[in-house]
Amino acid sequence: MFVLDSSSSVSLVQQIVDGFSHLVDEGTLRSGAKLPSIRQFAHAHGVSVYTVVDAYDRLVAQGYFVSRPHLGFFVRRRRQDDEQVPAGGDRYDFDSMYYMRRIFEHRGLSRKPGCGWLPEDWLFGEGVRRALRTLASGEISISGYGEPKGFVPLRQLVRDLLAEQEVALTTEQILLTQGSSHALDLIARRLVHAGDAVLIDDPSYANLCFGLRLLGADLLGVTRTPEGYDLALLEHLLQTPRPKVFFTQPRLHCPTGASATLAHMYRVLQLAEKYDVTLVENDIYSDLDPRPHPSLASLDQLKRVVYISSFSKTISPNLRVGYMAGHPELIEDLAQLKMIAGLTSAELSERIVYGALIDGRWRKHAKTLRERLTAAHEKIAARFLEMGFELFTEPKAGMFLWVRHPQIADANVLALRATEHDILLGPGHLFSPGLEPSPWLRFNIAFCEDEAVFDFLQQEIARAQKLGAAA
């Protein structure tokens, strides 16, 4: 087929991607051809399973492969064969890109308990409308670009908000971005190179996993626990092959909803210092946490921590305004990278967010939102427990519950069946650094009040029980 060269400067992941894409492009591998399984290819070529997983996932994302549950990987029909593809032919392709595409399509599935945002009537809509009216009534230039680091008054306000969390910094240490995903992308492109070992929560944010794979990173999952982390595993992974960065979400972790204890956070900082690792802290749900909870940034004071957060979850995801804070030299580098990639961020959006934040009703809205989420957690968690689901933890805050049922072995199969009922679920394999099959599911509690979702789950559990009894 093709030969891998371990001494090459090109990563093994990229060699596999290049090898297969060439075979498909030249017609050696034709549409519909079945490919070696991940384990078969890894064994035949003497590489790790994770290397092949990364390569296959990139080939799926680039349109060369399609993954079919329980069947394996196949060469996807190319564009010239599109007229031969039956309607709905991609329904089996529930990979990272399918999830990212369908979850944001307004014309897609109408019930989305697997999504990652709040319903419109839970957001600060009135505050946004007041900010828009204020902005429209004043004088604002629509020529030129905004500040490279973002709208200065908003950066100053972020500085003050972080000071309330015991993080001491200057305005120059803050960079505004187009949401937290943009911030994660910038820091990843600054710190991660193809072939690098990168530590990441397991499970983790699906979009981050996908983005790091595209950079050619070797993802090393640090198992999350209800208390925080598998600390023994973390230290083991830090010893070999010596990763230099750890992307983590200590508070209201996505997808599990768990928050790390103070003892676990101190230990993570100790290990980062011992092994010279940069910690990228994703804290986008901090405004949803009703309990006083320190951040890694507050414990470290941005010496080794890069802090990322966003206003998308509580004000409006459509505005796409986030930020990062860190060591002055690193923030200057990231500001330069931001300019190279897309010039400045959207100052109009930043001004709207600023107007919403200085609105006297903002803090009351945030408090009401936290109370509403707590009430929803109690109700939805009880519902899942009544149905026989296991909860990873009961966070009683934030947006997510991470659940599994003893009758459901592979959540991906359930998610595929859910699409036939106009329901989009969040199956666990999408949040796995290695894309391993998983029985776990992420549920957004704010979208779980639709009885159709629970009716479907109950039917599937009963169906699985009948199949088990028949076997």
Model-predicted segments: where are they?
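N-terminal basic, amphipathic alpha-helical segments
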Residues: 1-133, 335, 339-345, 375, ...
